[in-house]
Amino acid sequence: DSLALLHAMKILNRFYPKKLELYAITCNVGFEGMDFTGVRKFCESINVPYEQVDTEIAKIVFEDNKDERPCSLCAKLRKGAMYKRLGELGINKIAYAHNKDDFIETALMSLIYEGRFYAFPPVTYLPEAGVTVIRPMMYAPEKGVANFVINQGIKVVKNTCPVDGSTKREYAKQLMEQINSCLLYTSDAADE
């Protein structure tokens, strides 16, 4: 999703009256086998500066802490590393590639696990980091983003996180698929 957003913002820069200064950063959390060479090459191909911030987040989350909810801690540490680097570079905005499905899954997880309805807003200012977070793809469906990635020939980086595919987010994604299929089935039956 992130490379799709970067590519879309690069295209937008051709037409948008105010030029965007694009800079790509990847937070390498330290999972074995993660290879960001394709990201670097992609950024070079579209002429966007790129850097990789190396961290020991995987060690902290999976060895030192052994948290039962590693995703939450990992996300917080990744964001912290990113915001720190943004501050060092004097960058005050970050664009996350959260899509509509991410928004729905986040709201569903909040409802199930926290007993409240919460999801991220499209724009957030974080005073402690001095950063504004924007989510330009928040209304784009995941399938649309995936099609854009395929059509543009963007190479996807394989996630080597040991809990990938067995997370609360994955559960929320599967639950939404079940709900959608039930609603679709009900809608089809009502039409008959």
Task: Mark where each language-model region is.
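ATP-dependent adenylation/nucleotidyltransferase module used to activate substrates
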Residues: D1-A107, Y113-R116, K143-N151
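Residues at alpha-helix boundaries and short interhelical turns
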Residues: G33, N180-L184
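Conserved small/polar residues in nucleotide/adenosyl-binding loops
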Residues: Y185-E192
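Structural signal for conserved beta-strand scaffold positions within catalytic alpha/beta enzyme cores
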Residues: T26, Q52-D54, R135, K158, ...
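Catalytic subdomain that performs nucleotidyl-dependent activation
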Residues: L22, F103-S181
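Proline- and acidic/polar-enriched loop/turn elements at helix boundaries
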Residues: T55, T160-P162, E192
